[in-house]
Each structure stands twice: as C-alpha cells, then as structure tokens.
C-alpha cells in the first residue's frame, strides 16, 4: 500500500495505480506532448513556464514539513483509494485495456445491443407503418391534412407573392438547394421506410397515382419547400431594401455635414424647417407600410417626432416655471397672511398683536441706536489709528491748543446721544 520514501517526500501508491491505467497514461502523455510544444514555441512561453515550474517546486519543498504532519491521514486515504481501485478492477476490467481495445469493444457492444435492435425495430415499425397507412382512419386524416395544405398554399400565394428578379431567383435557388441538402437524408429515410420515391422538385406539381397518407406527406414536403422559397425571397428583398436605405442615409449624413461646413445659415434653416415639421401632430389615416423599409422609415420618423414633442413640452414647462413659482409663492403668502389674521381675530389677540408690534419696533430702534454708536466709536478709533500712522500725532503735540479743540470736538461728537431712529450715513469716518 502507501509507503514513504526518504528524501523524495510522501509516496502514494494510488496515484501510481491511477497513472498505470492505459487511458490515463495515454492522456497524460498527450498532455505532456502539448505542454512541451507550447513551452518550446517561443522564448517568452519557455521563460514563463520555467518560472512557473520553479515556483511550484519551491512551494512543494516549502510545504514538505507540513505534509509530514499529515502523513498518517494521507496513508489511510491512500489505502481507501487502493481498495476502491481493486473493486473497480474486479467489476470493470475493461478500464485496464488499451484505448484501441476499449474503442473496438465499445463499438461491438453498441452494435450488438443498440444498432441492431434499433434496425429490427425500424423494420417492424415500417411494417406497422404500412399497415397504419392503409387503414381507413389514416386515409381520412390524410385527406383532411392535404386539404389544410391546399388552404396553406392559397394563403402563401396571397400574402407571399413571388419576386420575379433574376438575381433574386439565383440567390433563392442557392439557399433552397442548401436547405434541401440539409434535409435530404431525412427525406431519403422516409422514402426508404414507406417504399415510395420522392415527388418531383418542381414548384407545386403533384406526382400522379398518389393517394392517402403518401399524398399528404408529399404535399407537405412541397408546401414546406414553397414556403421556404417564398420566405427566402422576401428576406433577400427586404435585406436589399435595407442596404439601399442605409446607403441613402449615409449619403444624407454626408450631405448634412457638407452643408454645415459650407453654408451654416442654410443648414440652420433646414434644421428649423425639419424641427417645425416634426413639431406638427402626427397625420391621420396614414397608409400602412407595405415593406420593411417603409416600416422602418415610419418608425424612425414617428420616434423622432415623439422626441421633438418631448423636448418642446419640456422647454415650455421650463419657461413657465418662474412665473408659476412666483404666482404660487404669492398665493401661499396671501393665504398665510389671511390665516394669521383670522386666527388673531378669532382668538381676540389684537392687544397682544399691538404689544408685540410695539416691542418689535422698540427692539429694532435699540438695535439701530446700538449700531449707530458702534459705528461712531469704530470710526473714531479708525481716525486715531490713521492719524498715528500718518504722523499727525507729532503735529498734535506741537499745536496743543488746536489738538485740544480737535479732541474736544471729537469727544463731543462721541458723547452726543443718538436721538434719531435711523443711523448716520458714516463711512470710514467721512461725514
């Protein structure tokens, strides 16, 4: 079982036994071959993989001491895996055969147990199918299905009119031939099962001397080919129309860019005309689009019209916002004033209102007086600082009398009470 080798780390017998399985061994060799090819492809890959190998080796050497701690548990796991491999070898010995032998054995087993029973069952189904096809109930159902296909042919001729164009016919023949090549094995298998040949590959002509279920099956095949052919023609025509429309759109864009670069005024005029056209309401009783190109043009035009209407509506709303806001604010203010007046009238708070008004006016007057005195004091100090900085203090010392009178006037100006409700218009000491 599991044995430990000195100097090379822990050795697992289960890994060796799994590697000795032919299928695993061949897979490992194949992977090694691919790895060597990728590694030796160029120098960058070689350096990258060598660095990765060195890193993995260093990591393996680093974790060796930690692995030694779990050696008993790993050995028990190795024993369990070896016992599982013994059971696998006893029950499925095919696993230890070479891959080629496994392939041939599997092929023989599938041939004996799957393919031949299926072929036998298909033969019996063929016989049962012939019996079922000849029953009256099947004949009745086939007639009804054939009638449904006939009605389907009429609808196809009405709504999917063939497009008579040489290039279209060439492309349609190529696509239909490709589709018929894809479905030909199924058709051949059905013909072999029911013992009849396929109908002619014409448009919609029935093969003579047909009846019952075979006639319904062949009619369904013709209807399927016809429907595929008409749908392919219509798809190609719509694709060409879209291609043509795309070219025209690109030409229009180039013309618009050239017009903007050469004549901006005319470009602006064209843009205004287009905007006015798209700003109009959608016309009523429009003709339904007959082709995909017309449908795309209609959807594009109406989508642009919706966008223009949205932009116009947003601009109108944005332009009316200031006026509406002012009107709403005025209305709210009037309502608030009216509500306050009603509350005061109902609560009989007229005296309180008058007292509050007088107190507010008195407080406002005191604030104005304090502000005026503060402004005068500030102006005086600013004048003294300015005089000190300009050297006027020396002049005041020499001319004491003039300075005394000036100081007396300044002190008188500072001590004069403010008997007015409004403040003086004093700015930085200038009166």
Curated annotation (Swiss-Prot):
Looking up Pfam families in the UniProt record yields: Perilipin
Query: What's in the keyword line of the UniProt record?
Result: Cytoplasm, Lipid droplet, Lipid transport, Transport
- Protein origin, superkingdom: Eukaryota
Q: Which InterPro entries match?
A: Perilipin (IPR004279)
List all Polar residues biased stretches: 418-431
Q: Name one GO biological process term.
A: lipid transport
This protein's GO cellular component annotations are: cytosol; lipid droplet; protein-lipid complex
- Positions of the region Disordered? 397-431
Q: Where in the cell is it found?
A: Cytoplasm; Lipid droplet
Q: What does the function comment of this entry state? A: Required for normal deposition of neutral lipids in the oocyte.
Q: Which family does it belong to?
A: Belongs to the perilipin family.
Protein's name according to its UniProt entry: Lipid storage droplets surface-binding protein 1
- Organism of provenance: Drosophila melanogaster
Gene that this sequence comes from: Lsd-1
């Amino acid at each position: 079982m599991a044995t430990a080798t000195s100097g090379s780390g822990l050795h697992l017998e289960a890994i060796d036994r799994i590697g000795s399985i032919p299928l695993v061994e061949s897979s490992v060799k194949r992977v090694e071959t691919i790895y060597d090819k990728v590694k030796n492809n160029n120098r960058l890959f070689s350096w990258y993989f060598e660095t990765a190998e060195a890193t993995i080796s260093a990591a393996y050497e680093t974790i060796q001491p930690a692995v030694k701690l779990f050696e008993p548990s790993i050995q028990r796991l190795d024993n369990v895996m070896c016992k599982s491999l013994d059971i696998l070898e006893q029950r499925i010995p095919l696993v230890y055969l070479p891959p080629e032998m496994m392939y041939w054995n599997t092929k023989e087993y599938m041939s004996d147990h799957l393919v031949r029973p299926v072929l036998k069952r298909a033969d019996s189904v063929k016989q049962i199918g012939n019996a079922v096809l000849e029953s009256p109930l099947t004949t009745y159902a086939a007639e009804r299905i054939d009638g449904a296909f006939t009605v389907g042919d009429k609808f196809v001729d009405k709504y999917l009119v063939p497009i008579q164009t040489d290039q279209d016919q060439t492309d349609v023949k190529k696509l239909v031939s490709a589709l018929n090549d894809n479905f030909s094995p199924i058709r051949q298998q059905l013909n072999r099962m029911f013992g009849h040949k396929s109908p002619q590959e014409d448009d919609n002509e029935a093969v003579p001397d047909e009846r019952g279920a075979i006639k319904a099956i062949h009619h369904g095949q013709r209807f399927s080919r016809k429907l595929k052919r008409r749908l392919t023609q219509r798809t190609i025509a719509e694709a060409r129309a879209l291609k043509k429309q795309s070219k025209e759109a690109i030409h229009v864009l180039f013309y618009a860019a050239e017009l903007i670069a050469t004549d901006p005024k005319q470009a602006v005029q064209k843009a205004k005309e287009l905007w006015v056209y798209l700003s109009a309401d959608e016309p009523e009783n429009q003709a339904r689009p007959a082709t995909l190109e017309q449908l795309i043009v209609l959807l594009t035009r109406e989508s642009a019209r919706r966008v223009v209407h949205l932009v116009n509506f947003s601009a109108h709303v944005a332009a009316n916002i200031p006026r509406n806001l002012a009107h709403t604010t005025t209305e709210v203010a009037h309502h608030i004033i009216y509500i306050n007046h009603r509350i005061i009238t109902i609560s009989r708070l007229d005296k309180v209102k008058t007292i509050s008004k007088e107190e507010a006016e008195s407080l406002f007057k005191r604030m104005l007086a304090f502000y005026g005195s503060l402004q005068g004091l500030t102006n005086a100090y600013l004048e003294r600082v300015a005089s000190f900085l300009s050297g006027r203090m020396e002049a005041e010392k020499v001319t004491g009398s003039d300075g005394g009178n000036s100081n007396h006037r300044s002190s008188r100006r500072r001590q004069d009470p403010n008997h007015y409700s409004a403040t003086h218009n004093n700015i930085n000491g200038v009166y």
